[in-house]
Swiss-Prot record:
Keyword Protein transport included in the entry's annotation: no
Location (main, coarse): cytoplasm
Organism classification: Bacteria, Pseudomonadati, Pseudomonadota, Gammaproteobacteria, Enterobacterales
Organism: Buchnera aphidicola subsp. Cinara cedri (strain Cc)
Enzyme class, spelled out: ligase
Gene Ontology BP annotations: alanyl-tRNA aminoacylation
Protein name as it appears in the record: Alanine--tRNA ligase
């Protein structure tokens, strides 16, 4: 039975049982910061379970797309190595919010699995687990379903910790929870059927878990205390791919109809003969291209944080496995096309076909970046290997390659294994783990104010005013609540109402003063933590007390320049959409009083001509003095109006819309002018590609533009004085200088090459012939690295069967090059020659079969030592015919 049919049957079954069929929700959870991705069918109903949302429908069934790549549900490392794990999967589920409970949930599951009309699975092959003190569930299975007692397994708490069991499900440390009953199906082939399964270990060995029924009947209010919920709920989950394994009678999810088609299509596309040992890599690539394609279709881009980092991790893991099977050029991006057909009959539309061009571009760019990192990282690894002793590499150095240069650990392992070099993987994992802890602690210190006990929320009232009479409701000094701040003390002040804008929407927070007749507090920055506006600064004069009535005054001049930059950012966003036929995706912005920075995703490049056009559009809108208005509405309504907003940002129910008439409309809670004319003027000062088709524009407005041109004018005048001409002629003069310089460099290279040819003639005349092999060993001076190689190549062209050793003295840095002609590479071992040299002059170096390069650990080389090396090498080469 094919996967599509199983899904359709499941939904039809529950439709007949009066369940409302819901579509799969997005892979990106809505209004839930606790999850990176949707990882279970119940995610979209979480608020109903938590009683934060009214239930319109009592019984629901879904087929939900899920991703499990981290945290409690981290399937990423298992993918390809086990038969049943993958990162993107479908979870079939039925849910009830008070309409039915344990008995019906169990009856429905049993009927769907075993009835002839539905899946018709063998009852003899089904085993059940239940929570040890859930006697109600036990009775239902034994007395109503009539399952054999030998097929019912009691699961206890782990380590005698109450409710810590595989059969007791929790939403979190606290909150809704309850016992569960799991359904397993006997899956071992080519063996006599095991008559009795008595433990969970045996279950996992012989059976496959196919369905988990969770009975949400408790609320955990402390670590040890749970109470009954007023209305119990049902939450069940059955992996579509897992049940497909059973119904299609195959070994693993990678042999089910959807995956087998994809894997075969991948084999054709990559045009590489896949060996049996590489099947794991092929499975990983097939899983990861599905997940990567769907995530990019959901507007997630590869990056270094959160969801973006997970996507990058998935892509790079697939690329590593591509590298292992011999794919050393971009290939992954081509595979995304296969997903269009592979996921055609999905129950959720990712719009892959419409977005395929964008998806391929993003994947291609990520691959190019990966191969650059790989090449650079491997070069650094080779250098490290050159200097190691006893074929053992330091774990800290491998960590640096991974953490600083991005070289994947798997590739380092493979490379070192080939070279018979070892390192302690457990020690390396410990270094990685400790580093992650350090980074987390740093981030907490930077971003988190959770160490402070906050009292009352503060209100922002500063969109149209610059000062406000306020009351101090809280003072924090050295992370503690205090009654007052005195002169020079650094601290945080919270007001009941404030005109200070806190850092948000890419805009920096306000600075200014909080003062009364007793003292002055200088506000250096304003931040927001939850609903508290924190004025961070120091006492300049006198003191400030709790409950004081104060005047809160923002830096008006600074605010106005920030407003200019923020309103200009909206004009820039709209102008970019006008220039490019395809829509751009805003990825972020930074706005202060000096400049604005705008990051956006776009497949196309901004030429110089387009940048000028962009500036003209924006400056014309500024000159027209267009009103800038705002309106408060619900996020739901705003989405229906197709208003621009950041795809990855979490918005509140109520949002603020900024309108620039007939040109721009965006969600934004930043501060703006009331008309475009107040921006003054606009100038782009930088444009670059910051990665993965993400472009960055840096621009200035108002007085900063005037200052920018004043500075340019000063430079122009200096150039005019220097060249005794006007600015219009300077470009031609500079061009002539550059061209002359190029010619001089070319002439210099010609002279150096001529010199190398002359040196080669002298060295050939000194070549020593021994045992039908030529040996040149000479000391040279001040020859560049590239030219030393060239000299070696010239010598090898002129003399067949040549061993050349060049010792180059280059201002206290003495390096060497050992090389042989190709016909000697299977006769003469260069490492042996290197060791002979090192026995006379200590040094380090390494390379290939035909060339070794390195350096000596001394400042000066005497000729008698070169003679000594020569004698030893002649003795060595005379051994070989």
């Amino acid at each position: 039975m094919k996967t599509d049919k199983i899904r359709a049957m499941f939904l039809q079954f529950f439709k007949e049982k009066n369940h409302k069929i819901f579509k799969s929700s997005s892979l990106i959870p809505k209004d839930d910061n606790s999850l990176l991705f949707t990882n279970a069918g119940m995610n979209q109903f979480k608020k109903i379970y938590l009683k934060n949302k009214k239930k319109n429908q009592l019984s629901i069934a879904t087929s939900q797309y899920c991703i499990r790549t981290g945290g409690k549900h981290d399937d990423l490392k298992k993918v390809g190595h086990t038969p049943y794990h993958h990162t993107l999967f479908e979870m079939l589920g039925n849910f009830s919010f008070g309409e039915y409970f344990k008995e019906n949930a169990i009856k429905y599951a049993w009927e769907f699995l075993t009835h002839k009309k539905w899946l018709n699975l063998s009852k003899k092959k089904i085993w059940i687990t239940y929570y040890y003190n859930d006697n109600e569930t036990k009775k239902i299975w034994l007395n109503i379903i009539k399952i054999k007692n030998t097929h019912l397994i009691k699961i206890y708490d782990k380590k005698n910790i109450k409710y810590n069991s595989d059969n007791f499900w929790k939403m979190g440390d606290l909150g809704p929870c309850g016992p569960s009953t799991e359904i397993f199906y006997y899956q071992k082939k080519n063996r006599k059927e095991k008559k009795s399964i008595k433990s969970y270990k045996e279950l996992e060995k012989y059976c496959l878990e196919i369905w988990n029924l969770v009975f949400m009947e408790f609320n955990q209010i402390t670590k040890k205390k749970i109470i009954k919920l007023p209305i119990p709920s049902i939450d069940t989950g059955m992996g579509l791919e897992r049940i497909s394994v059973i119904l299609q009678n195959v070994k693993s999810i990678f042999h089910t109809n959807n995956f087998i088609q994809l894997i075969e299509a991948i084999k054709k596309k990559i045009k590489i003969k896949i060996k049996k040992k590489n099947n794991v890599s092929l499975k990983i690539i097939s899983d990861h291209i599905r997940t990567s394609t769907c995530l990019i279709a959901e507007n997630i881009l590869p990056g270094n944080e959160g969801r973006n980092y997970v996507l990058r991790k998935i892509i790079r893991r697939a690329l590593c496995h591509g590298y292992f099977i011999g794919l050393q050029k971009p290939f992954f991006y081509k595979l995304s096309e296969l997903i269009i057909y592979n996921m055609k009959k999905m129950n959720y539309d990712f719009h892959i076909q419409e977005k395929i061009h964008k998806i391929k571009k993003i994947l291609f760019y990520e691959e190019k970046q990966f191969y650059y990192i790989l090449e650079n990282g491997l070069q650094k690894l080779k250098k490290i290997i050159k200097n190691i002793k006893k074929n053992k590499i330091c774990e800290q150095k491998i960590f640096t390659l991974y953490d600083t240069y991005g070289l994947p650990i798997q590739i380092t392992q493979k490379f070192c294994k080939k070279k018979n070099i070892s390192f302690n993987i457990n020690k390396l994992n410990l270094i990685i783990k400790n580093n992650k802890k350090k980074q987390k602690n740093k981030e907490k210190k930077k971003k988190n104010f959770s160490f402070i006990t906050f009292k009352k929320k503060s209100i922002f009232d500063g969109y149209h005013i610059y000062e406000k009479k306020s009351k101090i409701i809280q003072i924090i000094y050295k992370n503690k609540n205090v009654l007052k701040l005195s002169k020079s003390q650094l601290g945080i002040i919270i007001l009941d109402i404030t005109p200070f804008f806190s850092k948000s929407s890419g805009q920096i927070g306000d600075s200014g003063k909080i003062l009364n007749d007793k003292g002055i507090f200088i506000v250096q920055k304003t931040k927001k933590f939850d609903n508290y506006i924190l004025h961070i600064g120091y006492i300049k004069h006198g003191c400030i007390n709790i409950k004081d009535i104060v005047h809160a005054k923002i830096n008006k001049k600074k605010r106005k320049t920030i407003q200019s930059n923020h309103s200009a950012t909206h004009l820039l966003n709209a102008a970019l959409c006008k220039i490019f036929s395809e829509k751009i995706i805003q990825k972020g912005s930074f706005i202060n009083d000096k400049y604005l920075r705008f990051d956006f995703f776009c497949n196309k490049t901004l030429t110089e001509e387009k940048i000028n056009y962009l500036e003209n559009i924006i400056n014309k809108k500024i000159q027209k003095n267009i009103p800038i208005n705002f309106v408060i509405t619900s996020f739901k309504k705003a989405k229906k109006k197709k208003i621009k907003f950041l795809l990855e940002k979490k918005y509140k129910k109520t949002v603020r819309i900024i309108y620039i008439k007939n040109f721009s409309i965006e969600l934004c809670n930043g501060t703006h002018h009331d008309n475009t004319g107040k921006i003054g003027c606009f100038k782009i000062i930088a444009y670059n590609n910051i990665g993965n088709e993400i472009k960055r524009i840096t621009a200035i407005t108002g007085m900063e533009v005037i200052q920018y041109f004043n500075d340019k004018d000063k430079i122009n005048k200096k150039l005019e004085n220097l060249f005794s001409t006007n600015i219009h002629n300077i470009y031609l003069i500079a061009k002539n200088i550059v061209n002359k310089n190029k010619k001089l460099l070319e002439e210099n290279i010609k002279l150096k090459n001529k010199n190398i040819i002359e040196i080669s003639k002298i060295l050939i005349s000194k070549a020593y012939l021994s045992n039908k092999k030529f040996l040149i060993i000479e000391k040279t001076s001040y020859i560049e690295y590239k030219l030393l190689r060239k000299l070696s190549d010239i010598l090898k062209e002129k003399l067949k069967s040549l061993i050349v050793i060049l010792i180059n003295d280059n201002n206290k840095k003495i390096n060497f090059l050992i090389s042989i002609t190709k016909n000697l590479k299977h006769i003469i071992n260069l490492n042996n020659i290197k060791n002979i040299i090192f026995s006379v002059i200590p040094g380090t170096g390494g390379g290939k079969k035909t060339i070794i390069e390195g350096k000596f650990n001394i400042d000066k080389i005497h000729l008698y030592k070169i003679d000594k090396i020569k004698k030893k090498i002649i003795k060595y080469i005379n051994k070989y015919k």
